[in-house]
Design a protein with these regions (language model features):
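Small-residue hotspots at the loop-to-helix junctions and early N-terminal turns
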Residues: 51-62, 137-141, 200, 272-287, ...
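Residue-level signal for short hydrophobic patches within transmembrane helices
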Residues: 13, 17-36, 40, 63-70, ...
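Alpha-helical transmembrane segments and their lipid-water interface positions
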Residues: 34, 38-45, 68-75, 79, ...
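Short runs within selected transmembrane alpha-helices of multi-pass transporters and secretion channels
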Residues: 75, 143-162, 170-178, 199-214, ...
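Helix-terminus/linker motif at the lipid-water interface of multi-pass membrane proteins
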Residues: 32, 36-55, 124-131, 187-194, ...
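Transmembrane helical elements of multi-pass membrane transporters/channels
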Residues: 22-41, 143, 154, 177, ...
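Small-residue-rich hydrophobic transmembrane alpha-helices
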Residues: 54-114, 151-170, 264, 278-341, ...
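Short alpha-helical transmembrane segments in multi-pass integral membrane proteins
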Residues: 1-24, 82-147, 191-247, 303-368, ...
Length: 451
């Protein structure tokens, strides 16, 4: 299947459903492997190092997304610009956009490494991380960010490849890095008896491997999106476009992450068993999010390429098809998780209290995955049309401000952890109504004509 996939896909011609599905399949498989090796960290840590170490890894997840999310958002914006020029067949602009994006990634990766290592202790303390978990959380966080350049550049290179419709090569490289990560996890923790920091070290090494493989491919490919090391520099006009499209997406990621860090700090108040149980659920939720992730990526590329080629009706039809597929699959997975929650949580940790919290969160949230899928897909369509500021505003008002306000008030009225869990379905429902209105208006189709 992987070898049969084309190197790149022009979304502007051929069957709409086939183009989206053929592009989404490698994205799905790639995200599946990424989630598997993220889950491998938690499974190995939870079973070999215990609840404290599992809580440390779990508490670091939202914080890592906060630090990395903004840069990944910029990369998403860059992908929109690259896809637009690829769809319009403007080679010179395409080359400038790619090399400016890579230059940004190098600078951002260096800055992220320094900030992540310096700010780790202070932020974890502000999150209310329990004292018995804090030392291991700091070690995990600092080790991860010491190697964050690999994560940043991997996302940059994958963004370039996906924006020209190449999902095959990122998938192959991700499978390789996933295997490296799992083998190193087992070797460091089970074999050498190293601590929680070794799980982060294994992740960092595997990300460098995947970034290097992507870079070598871009340097060797004989296509208009070929990378030339001597051409890596900032082009002011391209940087402006990337920032215009990327900052709203980056800010949106940061807004979501800030809200999730706030949620995590409230969960931390219920103790390390709640932290471990909810952390286990978050790994399971990552699998449910896979169809959402692959269709959002596919939709952003599809819409951007077709609007760049001025094929407005085709962009609309593709958007409707992608949204329908995503919400259907996400809801089916949600039902499975609701039913199988006890078995799934037990795989991470057999402590009854850990299982209790994990199952409780699973059965509060899982049946509402269709709302999450819908919100993210419409946000992806808007980003692909050059309207990245619109989903940013919706996420800021709903997923951040309203979610934080709700939890702040609700927990004081009813100090039950389920009150925190309900924040997610509630805010997903509100954003879905708003995005449905924006999508049906149809003005997003002409977003590029304003820029």
């Amino acid at each position: 299947v992987i070898l049969a996939m084309k190197k790149s896909l022009r979304m502007t011609e051929g069957s709409i459903s086939q183009k989206i599905i053929f592009f989404a399949i490698p994205l799905f498989l790639g995200n599946l492997f990424q989630q598997l090796y993220n889950t491998a960290d938690s499974l190995i840590v939870g079973n070999f190092l215990g609840s404290n170490a599992l809580a440390a890894v779990s508490s670091s997840g939202n914080l890592i997304f906060l630090m990395v999310g903004f840069i990944n958002g910029i990369a998403m914006g860059a992908g929109v610009v690259i896809a637009r020029y690829y769809g319009a067949k403007k080679r010179d602009c395409l080359q400038k956009a790619i090399h400016t994006t890579v230059a940004f990634g190098l600078v951002a990766g260096a800055a992220l490494t320094v900030l992540g290592m310096l700010l780790a202790p202070k932020i974890l303390v502000l999150m209310g991380t329990p004292a018995d978990v804090l030392p291991e959380s700091i070690v995990y966080f600092r080790t991860y960010f010491a190697g964050s350049m690999g994560a940043v550049m991997y996302n940059i290179f994958v963004g370039v490849l996906q924006s020209v419709g190449d999902g095959r090569h990122p998938l192959i490289y991700l499978i390789i890095s996933s295997c490296v990560n799992v083998v190193l996890d087992i070797f460091f923790i089970a074999g050498l008896g190293m601590g929680v920091g070794s799980a982060a070290l294994a992740t960092a090494i595997s990300q460098f491997v995947s970034a290097l493989l992507c870079m070598v491919h871009l340097l060797r490919v004989e296509e208009e999106y070929r990378l030339e090391l001597r051409e890596i520099r900032f082009d002011s006009s391209m940087l402006k476009q990337i920032i215009q499209n990327g900052v709203p997406s980056g800010f949106q990621n940061s807004v979501i992450a800030i809200a999730n860090v706030f949620v995590q700090s409230n969960i931390n108040a219920f103790g390390k068993m709640a932290m471990a149980g909810c952390g286990s659920y978050s790994k399971i939720e990552g699998f449910a999010f896979l169809p959402v992730t692959c269709f959002t990526m596919a939709l952003t590329t599809f819409v951007s390429q077709n609007l760049g080629a001025k094929q407005y009706d085709r962009a609309k039809k593709g958007a409707r098809f992608g949204v329908f597929c995503s919400i259907t699959i996400a809801e089916l997975i949600g039902i499975i998780i609701y039913v199988a929650a006890p078995v799934l949580i037990t795989a991470f940790n057999r402590d009854p209290d850990v299982v209790h919290y994990g199952v409780m969160q699973s059965r509060t949230i899982a049946l509402f995955y269709c709302l999450l899928a819908f919100s993210h897909c419409i946000a992806a369509v808007l980003r692909g049309s050059g309207n990245a500021s619109v989903p940013m505003i919706v996420m800021l008002c709903d997923w951040c401000l309203f979610r934080v306000s709700y939890i702040t008030v609700a927990v004081r009225i009813l100090p039950d952890i389920r009150v925190i869990f309900w924040a997610y379905p509630l805010t997903w429902g509100i954003s879905s109504v708003i995005f449905l209105y924006l999508f049906l208006r149809g003005k997003w189709v002409y977003g590029f004509e304003k820029s």
